[in-house]
A protein has these predicted regions:
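Glycine-rich active-site loop/strand segments that organize a redox cofactor
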Residues: 102-136
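Core beta-strand elements of the Rossmann-like FAD/NAD(P) dinucleotide-binding domain
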Residues: 56-58, 244-254
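An anion/pyrophosphate-binding glycine-rich loop and adjacent beta-alpha core
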Residues: 291, 300-362
């Protein structure tokens, strides 16, 4: 059975997060013997966990089957854990934003350069040094992880710094901010010969399926509540709406929340981002449920005003679509003849169509 420290687990999961454009990961620490002793109610040694009618038990429960959820579940299972991986989407419609993103992986062999670049990207924002170090360490191991653990053949990798002929605009990401320290040591990779084809997501999904002896997957099963010991504050389980039936699952060694954002929750978008008109470019299932559950057990919020428009698409401009549809964006007007302009509802032109946009800072 494999052995992983807490930092190694977070770093490995962090690789997955970075590879899928910053998907969120938060882990709840397992109970220690001291925690369990503190949680005794004094009623004959009964613990808080004993007061709940459990319908099942796993070593680890992972909420959200996107890239970060898949990576977390696979590493936990590799360490010998019995894992439950749940997702609110139906089978065939899951994958979170990992499925819809460009499948582009930031990578470097130089950890110090990666660290310097990420710190420069953070600008004046205060970011925990240990978190920054974990990201930099993980991003230097991305290719090795995908090759050795997830089974991507060496010949499948494409380094777009060396060859961007399939999609010339990808060259702008190598690096995206060349003026920042460390940028010259960065590369971007894909696990296939193109982008926006869900290839990275399929790699993660296939690994999860191959570990079905240790990983159970429940679709159409959103988490609705976290069970938190009132004394130790440890999260010990999850309430799940499994296809309309409420089930309580105990997590003996922790709950991992890879729950995506809130881009499909109009009230949260208005409250946190100040937007009254927006259209999701990725999954239609990110409605902020996990954010609310995390707040319910005392989690602080950070960077809730930060969001990304499609950097390929003139800063995220979309045609008007129905609420149950993905954004329909302009991908790259520079590939056209030069005879196209973009105007708003009032007929005004307010941007340059002949230049690329860039992502905002971290």
């Amino acid at each position: 059975m494999g052995k992983y420290t807490r930092r190694q687990f977070i770093t490995s999961a962090g690789v997955g997060m970075a590879a899928v454009a910053g998907l969120g990961l938060a882990g709840c620490a397992p109970q220690t013997p001291a925690d369990k002793a503190m949680a005794n109610t004094g009623n004959g040694g009964t613990t808080f966990a004993d007061t709940i009618a459990w319908d099942g038990e796993y070593d680890v429960v992972v909420i959200g089957f996107g890239g970060a959820g898949a990576v977390s579940a696979c590493y936990a299972a590799d360490a010998g854990a019995k894992v439950l991986l749940i997702d609110k989407a139906p089978q065939g419609m899951g994958g979170g934003n990992t499925r819809f993103c460009g499948q582009i992986i930031l990578n470097s062999d130089d950890k110090e350069a990666m660290l310097a670049y990420n710190k420069a990207m953070a600008g004046d924002f205060a970011v925990d040094d240990e978190l920054m170090d974990a990201y930099a360490e993980g991003l230097t191991q991305t290719k090795t992880m995908l090759r050795d653990f997830f089974g991507v053949p060496e010949e499948n990798f494409l380094d777009w710094k060396e060859d961007s002929s399939a999609q010339p605009m990808i060259a702008m990401f190598v690096p995206e901010y060349p003026e920042l320290e460390g940028g010259d040591a960065l590369h971007v990779l894909t696990v296939s010969d193109n982008v926006c084809n869900s290839a990275l997501w399929k790699t993660y999904r296939n690994k999860v399926m191959s570990m079905s002896d240790n990983i159970d997957v429940w679709y159409m099963s959103p988490a609705t509540k976290l069970f938190q010991d009132p004394v130790s504050r440890a999260v010990i389980g999850v309430e799940i709406d499994k296809a309309g039936e409420t089930v309580n699952i105990r997590a003996k060694n922790g709950v991992v929340m890879t729950i995506g954002g809130f881009e499909n929750n109009k009230q949260m978008v208005e409250d946190f981002l100040g937007l009254t008109k927006s259209t999701p470019a990725g999954t239609l299932f990110n409605t902020g449920d996990g954010v609310k559950m995390a707040m319910g057990v005392g989690a602080d919020l950070w960077h809730m005003e930060a969001y990304e428009g499609n950097c390929f698409a003139l800063g995220g401009i979309s045609f008007v679509v129905n609420e149950d549809q993905h954004a329909k964006t302009f991908n790259d007007l520079r590939n056209l003849s030069g005879s196209v302009i973009v105007v708003g509802n009032g007929g005004e032109r307010n941007l340059r169509e002949d230049v690329y946009n860039r992502h905002g800072h971290v």
